[in-house]
C-alpha cells in the first residue's frame, strides 16, 4: 500500500480496502457516481469519516454530485497497489490454514498465496487448492523471491520460533492468526487476527452499546 508515502492516518489506511471493494462492485454494476451517504450505508462508516478520509487524497467529490466511480476505482487501485501482484506464503496447513488456502483471495484482489509450508510429512508435497505445500525445514533452501508477507497459522507453541525464522528469511509483514503476541524487530509489521478477542468485544458492545 502506498498510503505510507501519502502520510495518511493508519485508521484511514485500514478503511481503504473496504472502500475499494464496494467501489469495485459499483463499477461492475455500471454505476457512474456514488454519494458519501450511499457509501456510508454500504460500508457502515459514517459519512463525515468518509469525507475526511477522502479529503486526504485531495478533493475527490463534488457537492450535490458525489464521487465519480471510475475515478475512485483507478485512484484506489493505484493507492492500494492493485495493479501489482502481492505474493504471500502461509505457514501451518492445519484446519485454519487449509480453510484460508481454499479461499480464493485473488478473486477480489491481487494478493496470491504462492507457497504453503508445514512440518507434517503427509502434507508436504501435496496441494491445497492451487497452492503447493512445502517442507518448512527447507524454507531457506526454497527461498522467498518477491514474497514479503506471511500468514501464520501454526499451533501457538510454534508461533514465536516460526516468526523468528520468517523474519530471518526476509518477511516484512505477518498476518498472525495464532493467539501469541509475537516479538519482532521494529521494522516488521504484525497484524493480529484473534477471533476470541473479536467475539468478546462483540459481546461487550452488544451489552453496553445497544443500537
Ligand atoms: N481453527 C480455528 O478455527 C482457529 C481460529 C482462530 C485461531 N486459530 C489459531 O490458528 C492456529 C492454527 O490452528 P488450527 O486449528 O489450524 O491448528 P492445526 O493443529 O489444525 O494446524 C496446525 C498446522 O501447523 C503445522 N505445524 C506445526 N508446527 C509447525 C511448524 N513449526 N512449522 C510449520 N507448520 C507447523 C501442523 O502440522 C498443522 O498442519 C492456532 O494457533 C490456533 O490457535 C485457529
From Swiss-Prot:
Chief location: cytoplasm
InterPro entries in UniProt: CoA-bd (IPR003781), NAD(P)-bd_dom_sf (IPR036291), Rex_DNA-bd_C_dom (IPR009718), Tscrpt_rep_Rex (IPR022876), WH-like_DNA-bd_sf (IPR036388), WH_DNA-bd_sf (IPR036390)
Cellular component GO terms held in the UniProt record: cytoplasm
NCBIfam families cross-referenced by the UniProt entry: PRK05472.1-3, PRK05472.1-5, PRK05472.2-3, PRK05472.2-4, PRK05472.2-5
Name of protein: Redox-sensing transcriptional repressor Rex
GO MF assignments: DNA binding; DNA-binding transcription factor activity
DNA-binding region per UniProt: 18-57
Subcellular localization: Cytoplasm
Cross-referenced PANTHER family: REDOX-SENSING TRANSCRIPTIONAL REPRESSOR REX, REDOX-SENSING TRANSCRIPTIONAL REPRESSOR REX 1
HAMAP family from the UniProt entry: Rex
Binding site for NAD(+): 92-97
GO biological process, one term: response to redox state
Keywords: Cytoplasm, DNA-binding, NAD, Repressor, Transcription, Transcription regulation
Annotated source species: Shouchella clausii (strain KSM-K16)
Record family assignment: Belongs to the transcriptional regulatory Rex family.
Amino acid at each position: 500500500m502506498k498510503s505510507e508515502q501519502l502520510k495518511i492516518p493508519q485508521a484511514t489506511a485500514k478503511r481503504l480496502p473496504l472502500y475499494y471493494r464496494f467501489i469495485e462492485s459499483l463499477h461492475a454494476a455500471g454505476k457512474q457516481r456514488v454519494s458519501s451517504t450511499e457509501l456510508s450505508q454500504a460500508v457502515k462508516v459514517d459519512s463525515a469519516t468518509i469525507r475526511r478520509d477522502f479529503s486526504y487524497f485531495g478533493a475527490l467529490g463534488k457537492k450535490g454530485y458525489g464521487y465519480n466511480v471510475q475515478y475512485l476505482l483507478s485512484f484506489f487501485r493505484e493507492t492500494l497497489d492493485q495493479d501489482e501482484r502481492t505474493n504471500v506464503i502461509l505457514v501451518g496447513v492445519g484446519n485454519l490454514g487449509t480453510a484460508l488456502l481454499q479461499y480464493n483471495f485473488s478473486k477480489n484482489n491481487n494478493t496470491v498465496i504462492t507457497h504453503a509450508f508445514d512440518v507434517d510429512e503427509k502434507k508436504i508435497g501435496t496441494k491445497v487448492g492451487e497452492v503447493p505445500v512445502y517442507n518448512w525445514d527447507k524454507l531457506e533452501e526454497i527461498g522467498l523471491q518477491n514474497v514479503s508477507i506471511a500468514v501464520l497459522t501454526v499451533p501457538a507453541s510454534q508461533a514465536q520460533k516460526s516468526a523468528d525464522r520468517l523474519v530471518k528469511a526476509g518477511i516484512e509483514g505477518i498476518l498472525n492468526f495464532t493467539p501469541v503476541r509475537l516479538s519482532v524487530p521494529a521494522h516488521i509489521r504484525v497484524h493480529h487476527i484473534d477471533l476470541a478477542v473479536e467475539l468478546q468485544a462483540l459481546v461487550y458492545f452488544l451489552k453496553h452499546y445497544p443500537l
